[in-house]
Amino acid sequence: MIRKGVQYITSIRERAPVVYYNGEVVKDVTEHPAFRIPVKTVAKYYDHHWEEESLRIYNKDVGEESSISFLRPRSKAELKKLREGLVRIYDSYYGFFGRSPDYMNMWTTVFSAHSEDYFERAFGRKFAENVINIYRESVKNDFFYTHAIVAPMYDRSRPPSQWEDPFIQIGVVRETNEGVIVRGAAMISTAAPYAEMLWYLPNVRRDSDPKYAIFFSIPTNTKGVKFIARRGFQPREGFGAFEYPISSKFEESDAILILDNVFVPWDRIIFYGKPEEIEGFMWHTVRLRTWFNWHFVIQHYSRLKFLAGLAITIAEAVGINNFINVQKKLGELLIYVSMNEAALFGAEEAAEELPNITRPNSYISISMSHFNMKLLPRANEILKSISGGSSIPIPSGLRDFENPEEKGLLEKYLASKGLNAIERVKLFNILWDVIGSESGVRYEQYDRFSRGDPTIRWAQTYYEVFKERKAEFTKLVKQVMDQMPNPRV
C-alpha cells in the first residue's frame, strides 16, 4: 500500500500520541504551530510517490505495491535503483529533513532480510517471525516510524545499572505471559511527535545488563508512551516562507521519549536478553551501521549539491567569483559533492552480495559518512566566509517590499550584479536560514553529532571498521622493509 498525504494526516490526528509542548499536552499535532510544518512535509512525501512513478515498486516480498524505500535489493542493479529513488526524495528536500519516512522503512527492510541468518539464529524462530510480520505490516500500512536509541546522559562515569534508578535508561521491569513491561527514557527521538510507530533500539555498550537488551516496535500512542518535544524552530509569528525558506518547509522536531511502565507484547519484540548479540546486529551479520551511514551519504550528497549551488550563486551575485581565494572555496565545495557521489557509486560497485540482500560496501559508506561529520560544518563555514557581512543587512520581511516608499529605496540600494533587490533578499534569506537561524544551527549540530562524537567515530574507523583490513595495509610497508638491505654484521 502507498498512502496519500491526507491519509497520513488523518491517521496521526486520530492516533493522538501524548506529546508535551510548553507545559501542555498537544491536542492535535497536525495543527500545532510547532509541528504542522513537518506534518505537511511528511504528507508531501507520501503524495510525491503518486506524482513520480519511479518512487513506487511492486514489492515481491509482500505481494503489493510499496514505496521504493521498502525495496530489499538482491543485486547491485536493485541497490542502484534504491539509491536513485532515495536521491530523488532527498533532492526534493535539498538534503534536509533527514528523518523522512523512508529512513526507517529502510531499517525495517534490512531487519526482514536477516530474519533467518541473524534473528532466528540469535533469538529463535518466534523473534524471526516477528521481524517478518512487522515488515509486512509496515509495507501494507505504509506507517511512519520514528526511532530512539540514545540513553540519558545521567552519569557517564557509571553504567546505568549502578545509577540511583537503574530504569533511567530503558529496561525490562518484568516479564508476563503476554509480553514485558518496560520503563525509562531515550533522547533525541527525531520526528516522534508526528510519527505513528516507534522502534526502540538498545544501548548496551555502556552496560551489558540483559534487562537493557531489548529491541521492539510499538505504536506511538501506546499507553505510557510520552514525548517531550523541544522548542519549535518554525518561522517567527508574522513571517513565513519568504523570510524562512528552508525552515518553513524542513523544520524537524526532536523529542525525549518516556516509557512509563509500557506493556510491549511478545510479538512486537525482535531482540531480547542477549546483549552480546548487539555486535552482530551493528557490525557483523546485519551491519545496521553500514545501512544508516549509507543513507546519511545520500542525504548529504543532496545537501552538498544545494550548498555548492548556494555558494556559487552568492559569489556570482556579489561579483567575487573571479577572486582566486573565493574560487578555491567554491572548488572545495564541488570536491565535497564529487567525493560523496563517488562514495555512493563505489559503495554500489563494491557492494556485498549476500544470500538475502545486497549491501552497500561498509568501508566506503561508513568512512564517507564519518568524514561528512566534519565536512558539512566546513561547508557552512565556507558559506559564511564567502557571504561575509552581506548576510546581515537584510530587510525584515516581505512587507518591506509592499511599502511603496521603502520598496523604491530597496530596489535602488540592495540590487547587485545580476540580481534585483527582491532576488538578492531571497538569496540571502536562504543563506541565513541555512547558517544562522535556529533551524540552521540545529541542522549543523545534528550533522556533527547524529552518529555520535566525531572523535570517537573517526577513531572507530581505525579500531573497528577497518579491523579486518589493517593487516592488508601494514603488509605493504613490511614488503618494502623486507626488500631493504640489512647491515653486514
Model-flagged regions — what are they?
Residues 36, 40, 136-139, 181, ...:
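Generic structural signal for well-ordered, non-transmembrane alpha-helical segments
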Residues 150, 316, 342-349, 377-384, ...:
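Charged/polar positions within long, soluble alpha-helices
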Residues 292-353:
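Extended amphipathic alpha-helical segments enriched in small hydrophobics
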Residues 324-331, 359-367:
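Short, charged, amphipathic alpha-helical segments
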Residues 363-489:
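Alpha-helix capping/hinge segments and adjacent helical runs
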